[in-house]
UniProtKB/Swiss-Prot annotation:
Predominant location category: Golgi
Encoding gene, per UniProt annotation: Acbd3
Species the sequence originates in: Rattus norvegicus (Rat)
Start and end residues of each stretch annotated as Disordered: 13-68, 180-226, 318-343, 444-464
GO molecular function ontology, one term from the record: fatty-acyl-CoA binding
Residues the record lists as N-acetylalanine modifications: A2
The protein, known as: Golgi resident protein GCP60
Alphabetical GO biological process terms: steroid biosynthetic process
């Protein structure tokens, strides 16, 4: 009869699952135990899902399904849904290749798959199946036999049935688990690497910002320092111009006359020489000013130390009009202007008269000298040699004094000198005496401070006082210092403080073996 179809010869694909009945059942298919992993105990009350088995919904069933899902996840290493997806993929790939399920097993797989996708069978929503559709009727009957089985139970039964039919599922899932673990390791390693890179970028960014801030601070400090230095330079330059203008106004006439004598008719050379003289005059003035300031500081410090040592008490008696080491020096640049010689100590009668009648009129203020150098030493000595009286020999241990009286028509004294091969001491003094002789004279003396002190030891105070009264007063214009006049010409000028005699001292007392030849010239200007 046509209705009697050999069902075992049919092969139908339903919902992606192939149903191919096998005439020969696999050995051990009937009643074979479910092949689950040894570490996972079998679920109580959940068999192979035979047809007609119905599960009543309830709290106990739900708890049992959840517990079974946890056990499977612990053993297989995947969640239930992920494990079901792997099992379904394995079934589609390996069906008919790695394993050959029976017709009933295929019906069971299809029914469980439908239960997972659509839930329990509902005849109202399912399409009608023809009377002769044997496979459709078997499939619907198997699906209906599952009853109200939950989705989780259906997935569990599907995995168990597939594991029973094909033990290779365990290896398949294990390989995916290993792959998943490796992927997780790679993901964690990548995440750690990105985190380290992010931390490194943040660190480098912070270091770069710190370096930029430090660089900006350094540039700002350098800019402030450059601005401060430039302002200081401009201030000093302005101060220098003001001082030079004041000094040049005082020496303009002398320098112009001196330059006219050196380069007559050559205006350009005269201006060059005047600028050189003005610059040297400024340098000399600043040096003297610094020396005065330093001497004031040292004197103040020494006085403070003396006060600390001696206490608050001061000496009861002091000498009258005696110049001491701690006397304040002038601060207007006119160093050594009023330096008094020890020869100017007042005698007792003069001191008493000064105390009774008050001080006499002071001497005129002495202007500071101007001194400079110029390198034309060879030409200077050649010119001076033409006048034999302008070349003098200062023997060893001697001091030669050139006395130059002031001239009635003069206002300034100029001097120039040089030596052959060695330096010599030089200084200028002004003697307050009215000399009837206007001629220049040269005096030689064997100066020795020790000899003068020995001679003074044998002189009584009365004789010393009379001797000092007879001596004219002296003012030091230029202190005696050794000058390198064998290398360049030393020159200078000084404004007359009044009528008197200039004493130009060439001191060779420090030399024990050598005599010095001095080439000098003195003249006055109005």
């Amino acid at each position: 009869m046509a209705a009697q179809l050999n069902v075992e010869q049919l092969e139908v694909s339903l919902d992606g699952l192939t149903l191919s009945p096998d005439s020969e059942e696999r050995p051990g298919a009937e009643g074979a135990p479910l092949q689950t992993p040894p570490s996972s105990p079998p679920r109580d009350g959940l068999g192979s899902g035979t047809a007609g088995q119905q599960r009543e919904p309830g709290e106990a069933a739900a708890e049992g399904a959840a517990e079974e899902a946890r056990r499977m996840e612990q053993h297989w290493g995947f969640g239930l849904e992920e494990l079901y997806g792997l099992a379904l993929r394995f079934y589609k790939i390996k069906d008919g290749k790695a394993f050959h399920p029976t017709y009933e097993e295929k019906l069971k797989f299809v029914a469980l798959h439908k239960q997972v996708l659509l839930g329990p069978y509902n005849p109202d929503t399912s399409p009608e199946v023809g009377f002769f559709d044997v496979l459709g009727n078997d499939r619907r009957r198997e699906w209906a036999a599952l009853g109200n089985m939950s989705k989780e139970d259906a997935m569990v039964e599907f995995v168990k049935l597939l594991n029973k039919c094909c033990p290779l599922l365990s290896a398949y899932v294990a390989s995916h688990r290993i792959e998943k673990e490796e992927e997780e390791k790679r993901r964690k390693a990548e995440e750690e690497r990105r985190q380290r890179e992010e931390e490194e970028r943040e660190r480098l960014q912070k270091e770069e910002e710190k370096r930029k801030r430090e660089e900006e601070d350094r540039l700002r400090r350098e800019e402030e320092e450059r601005r401060r230095i430039e302002e200081e330079r401009l201030r000093l330059e302005q101060q220098k111009q003001q001082i030079m203008a004041a000094l040049n106004s005082q020496t303009a006439v002398q320098f112009q006359q001196y330059a006219a004598q050196q380069y007559p008719g050559n205006y350009e050379q005269q201006q060059i020489l005047i600028r050189q003289l003005q610059e040297q005059h400024y340098q000399q003035y600043m040096q003297q000013l610094y020396q005065v300031q330093l001497a004031q500081q040292q004197a103040a410090l020494q006085k403070q130390q003396e006060v600390v040592v001696a206490g608050a008490s001061l000496p009861a008696s002091t000498k009258v009009n005696t110049a001491g080491a701690s006397d304040p020096l002038p601060v207007n640049g006119q160093a050594k202007t009023h330096t008094e010689n020890p020869e100017k100590v007042l005698e007792p009668e003069a001191a008493e008269e000064a105390l009774e009648n008050g001080p006499k009129d002071s001497l005129p203020v002495i202007a500071a000298p101007s001194m400079w150098t110029r390198p034309q030493i060879k030409d200077f000595k050649e010119k001076i040699r033409q006048d034999a009286d302008s070349v003098i020999t200062v023997r060893r241990g001697e001091v030669v004094t050139v006395r130059v009286p002031t001239h009635e028509e003069g206002s300034y004294l100029f001097w120039e000198f040089a030596t052959d091969s060695y330096d010599i001491g030089f200084g200028v003094y002004f003697e307050w005496t009215d000399s009837p002789n206007a001629a220049v004279s040269v005096h030689v003396s064997e100066s020795s401070d020790d000899e003068e002190e020995e001679e003074e030891e044998n002189v009584t105070c009365e004789e010393k006082a009379k001797k000092n009264v007879n001596k004219p007063l002296l003012d030091e214009i230029v202190p005696v210092y050794r000058r390198d006049c064998h290398e360049e010409v030393y020159a200078g000028s000084h404004q007359y403080p009044g009528r008197g005699v200039y004493l130009l001292k060439f001191d060779n007392s420090y030399s024990l073996w050598r005599s010095k030849s001095v080439y000098y010239r003195v003249y006055y200007t109005r």
